[in-house]
Amino acid sequence: MSSHPIQVFSEIGKLKKVMLHRPGKELENLLPDYLERLLFDDIPFLEDAQKEHDAFAQALRDEGIEVLYLEQLAAESLTSPEIRDQFIEEYLDEANIRDRQTKVAIRELLHGIKDNQELVEKTMAGIQKVELPEIPDEAKDLTDLVESDYPFAIDPMPNLYFTRDPFATIGNAVSLNHMFADTRNRETLYGKYIFKYHPIYGGKVDLVYNREEDTRIEGGDELILSKDVLAVGISQRTDAASIEKLLVNIFKKNVGFKKVLAFEFANNRKFMHLDTVFTMVDYDKFTIHPEIEGDLHVYSVTYENEKLKIVEEKGDLAELLAQNLGVEKVHLIRCGGGNIVAAAREQWNDGSNTLTIAPGVVVVYDRNTVTNKILEEYGLRLIKIRGSELVRGRGGPRCMSMPFEREEV
């Protein structure tokens, strides 16, 4: 076995180890009035979402893949009382609690939870004001009075089951991301503790991006096309400045990649990440949403004389990919088969967001029937999972998974 606990040098190598997060009580803290604040469009039914997620995890195990869980890894990282206390204080500091008495009450509540995983899951779920002792009227400050109708002392983290985004494994390294929205940036705290203190991963993995950066990048915009070539998305959630910082670190730390293809496409919620419109499913096959093709700009980025060299690519995308992957021809498989209605509907339901677990073997939502049929016509083996509730969060199988180990291809 390699001495590196993280080994991810492709999108398609046989998946051996993956991290998920089983949806928890955080989904039951979603309210209609605050969906936009928490980056949701709808409210999943937790019981069914958990059943769907458990079936997803079991489908991976049935393929011989070891499934890890974020909540367990984070709990295992609290290896001493001092680290546990530090975690609670950082969590409180990042929760934007404006009232001192509320902060004291939450600290007491969290310290009263003795089991580490229960503690971690509570921080994920959020804290309602009704869980805390009532503040006497005479002790309330202006913040308490003005925000009296808001039900949460600390917001939930309902997007956590999309484990692809808070950090990304790249080769033997990790990009610990600074995320687009404050409501999600708190999620990266768990990755910080895993890669700093976990018995297996702590202190053993190079960071090529740090959550303390002030520019934004998310894992859905970080794809590994081969051991030499990365793809990154300039999207609603990831800006060009972050990509430049990431790439300089990757090249300087000699992580192993020689070139990056940067994809610039429409900046909107429909296409929030590159992997919602473009994924690799085999050595020479990709899914793509046809709506991005007209406005797509691709830049080749290399590192020469200690600086980035950036060239805009003007040619055909399939030819560009074939050239960079060293294959004769690349097939772009269009979501919805090019039918404008099917493409829009199935992209919204993550028809382009596939998780490849081996060359030509992909996990997909069963609901995207048009796209799935086309994938099968291209000779791919599909592992179809239900996602009626999971999809309400606007993410598919790739969004819900973070590979920790793949075989080389």
Swiss-Prot record:
Signal peptide: none annotated. It is an enzyme of class 3 (hydrolase). Keywords: Arginine metabolism, Cytoplasm, Hydrolase. Its EC number is 3.5.3.6. GO terms for cellular component: cytoplasm. It is found in: Cytoplasm. Pfam families: ADI. The active site is at residue 399. Belongs to the arginine deiminase family. This is Arginine deiminase.
